[in-house]
Amino acid sequence: MSQAQPLPSAAYPQCQVEGVAVGFMSVCSRVNMQLLHECFDLGPFHGLCIPHPDDVLQPPEELSIKGSQDAELGTSNLSSLKIVEEPREPVSPGALEGIQDIENLSQRSTMGDTNGSVSCLSLASVSLSEQTSDFRPIYKGASAAFCIQLFCIEEKYEARSLDFMNFVFSLFPEKNFCTISVPHLTPEFALIQNFVKIVPFNNCTLEQDLYVFHRAGLLKSINIRLATSLDTPGVENLVSTLMLNKSILEDLKQYSKARRHHDGTPMKAFVAEVAEQIVGIAVIRDEMDVEYIRSHYNIEDFIYFSHHQREEHGHLYHFALNPVFRHYTKFFLKEILRLGYKSCLYYPVYPQIREGKFQSSYAHSLTSALHYLVPVRPRRQIVYPLEKLGINAPSKAVSKDPLNYALNHTNRKLTLEPKITVNAKIVVVGASSVGISFLETLVFCSHLKFSNLTLISTHGLPGKNLLGTEQRKFLASDHCFHDKDYALMSLCSWVNVVVGRMTAIDRAAKHVVLSKKEIVPYDHLILCTGQQYQVPCPTGADISQHVTNREIPNSRKQRYTDKVPCNHFTLNDEEDCCKALSWIRDNSIIAEGNVIVYGNTIDTYTTVETLLNIGVRGSYIHLVRPPPTSTVTCINNYSVESAVEDALSTAGVTIYRDALLAQWNDGQYPDPIHSACFTAPTKPFRLTCAMFFSFCEKNVDYETFKALNDACLVYDGRLVIDTKFHTNDIAIRAAGSLTKFSNKYYSNEWTHSSFSSKEIGFQLAAAMLSLFDPTLEPVTEPPADLDQLIPMYKGAKIQGGILPGSYHYLHIAKPAIPIPLEVQMAQSNFGLEIVTGNAKDGTYFRIHINQYKMVETITCLSKEPFPASNYICLFGQHEQLLNNLCARYEDKLIPDLYSYFTEPWCMALFHDRFIDLRKELRRILTSKEEEDLPSIEQLAWQIEAEEINLNEKPRKYLKRVFQETIYKSLVEKSILDYLHYNHYHLPMYARPGTI
């Protein structure tokens, strides 16, 4: 029962149960429409106003469409998409009786080609011109909204919250919209789960989220059914303003005509109907690539394949639903599954640009249901030696070239599981590997929906594949992420991307200031900017005076403040590399002109190789090395360095050692650079210059440093953090090479730079998830006096690339303080070195086995490409797992490690679930499987404690106990189950019944 005491502009309804009030609401018809229009994009609901002839709804010029998900200050989170345009006609007050004029669903498409688009609107952004970027529609009509000011209800009656809405709409018969604003950190309660969250404009600084509910949303008589040919006019009306309406209507026509797609795939179309009007359309097809999905995505995190028939897998092709009824999205999906006789639905999101063109051939329509699906993690794939495996190779459905799409999924079970919405504003500054890993971890938490993830980056999201997959890279790789990994994640579907540079942090107001004075508010700020190559500061020495390095004061700490010459390049990401490549081609550098590469890092080698590869003559390339700052070289392996330097010499590249940059253009105006002067330990020299690459020591960008310093964040050479990633501001965390541990840990030699960036990002996300995930156990902070040790991460530190001589290089090592290789090998506990091949021949393969018989370091140098992802899996494995590697090597049975690791027996080592098998086997050996029999682990402890008197060697005793007890059969069963369950990836292993 609801009661109200009406006032001219306000009412206070309450809910009662048996005469006792259990809920209360305060509603008001006075709404600050001007503020809402300034702060929120209300275009989908015609500004919450009654349509008026003088409304200004379009900008003076058409939008300029740009094929990039990284439009400046553009957001690409699906929750922030403009799904509908203004309604053509208002909904009449009698809509509850029978709606004839429900707003037509519309989409502001970003494509000019109606034949197809990218798979999801979030993958394309609109780049606005100066004149239109700030355009806001002007609404002249009267307000059509009232607002909820207060609301409360007893928890046990919370599910009945929507019952209020029938009554309050009856109090305002002339209003069609109800609004409510709540602090954005407020958890979503039952009432607003039926509302539509409105997208704020970029310049909105309100600390409130706005939700809107339409009168028509009260209709309970929504009917989902199979489409018929008679529904075509209704669907046309629904999607008439969609850019993809042609594609949807063609598929609907094809369904009505043949029930199959043009390629013969069975398909079905469904409509959602309210009051005899079509308000939603969905088209599904049978999923024909089930084997590919199972083998390339972790879909088994959500389903057991054996529980689903092949024909029960469906592919969601189109989905469009009037946002007035968005709270029925899950119901729509459930009905699609029921009526379509499906148990699973899949929705792929393809990368937006491939080779610079929109991939309309891969296009689907916008699915406004994306946030009701879960993203599925891609699986790491084995690189198979197909020719060597022959008939034992996996099927083509498994081993074919990856399609590189991000997969989203739902099933019957998931439609019944609610997602926990996290509205906290989490802002990540810097698209480094740490930042991407952090975002990846949050996005793939399937039971959480982060609605306010924002990335601020100079060039937006990485992975645009600007240089092409096969193009030589200027920069070495850390193998954390590749271009295909970004496509498989599709972070732009879930993360707002702001293109810009951080220039200030207002800790009091909790917002970040960007280079063009825009602000981005935050609740949690994550700083992952890393370090970048900086423009070197010439010492200013006059080489005509024949000065040497000894006469030059140390200028490494000086910052270059003059204009950066147009032909000077510091390469920090793929955008920088692409600009450099374009400049080379536009200025005829390939045919003529000296190129100077200045620095001591591995990137100097990869850049020289790229220059040689694109056609620059070696005699035009000058590799200038400044005096080293460490005794450890960038490669730290004499054999590899010797092979590379021989290749440089053969190519005609000139190398200068221990040279300091003295002047550009003999001290005259440096733009552009025509010459560069250097001092050396003996005689200075001068080089003509058409292009200058600088790879001097990396450092924190000055603008970033100034922003941190002005914000009074503790900075001591790097941003100071504790072991939980906290800065001195509880709301600001930082990670990566930007940071250092506080001096209280007495561990200045160890920083995040010593570890895998991907693992650092994962651990940062894990530390933050405890704030948002109610399923996690609360983390107990250790007492301050016990917080004395820094965490030690175990993931491999990797670097690789193509070096001069077209050598493919890979180095995998455990995190460590850099030490010269010769010093490492001289230590008593070094272990064993296994080397095959020769570096100069391009057949070099080195494995370091430590004193515990574990693989600790891998170095490869090859003229031929090799499966780097396979070799990374070898790190941390015991040598016996590698088919008794040490014994075979000592017996001279392994002439070539490259060939050795293409043999069929080792494919399981490269499988992504091999680690799960290891954990399962360890669990068996550490658990007590029989009451009167201790576990194998307990036996080992008893032997170590001398509680058991043995007449034989401990290893032999443990082996005998293992074979004579239940443990052997349990281990064998577990291995066979593993091979059976993963047979599609591992068909080269014999199983019972194979022969």
Briefly describe each language-model feature range.
Residues M1-Q3, F213-Y255:
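Short amphipathic alpha-helix that is part of the acyltransferase structural core
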Residues N32-K197, E287-L373:
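Acyl-donor binding region in acyl/amide transferases
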Residues L416-A504, T539-R550, R585-D586, I590-S639:
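Beta1-alpha1 glycine-rich phosphate/pyrophosphate-binding loop at the start
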Residues D478-D483, M489-D506, V512, L612-D722:
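A Rossmann-like FAD-binding core segment of flavoenzymes
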Residues S544-R559, K563-R585, I589, K683-K758, ...:
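FAD-site-proximal beta/loop scaffold in flavoenzymes
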Residues M1-V17, M243-A269, E273-A275:
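Active-site rim helix/loop that mediates acceptor-substrate recognition in acyltransferases
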Residues V520-Y533, L687-K698, G761, K853:
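Short hydrophobic core segments
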Residues L738-S869, D916-L970:
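Mid-to-C-terminal Rossmann-like scaffold of FAD/NAD(P)H-dependent oxidoreductases
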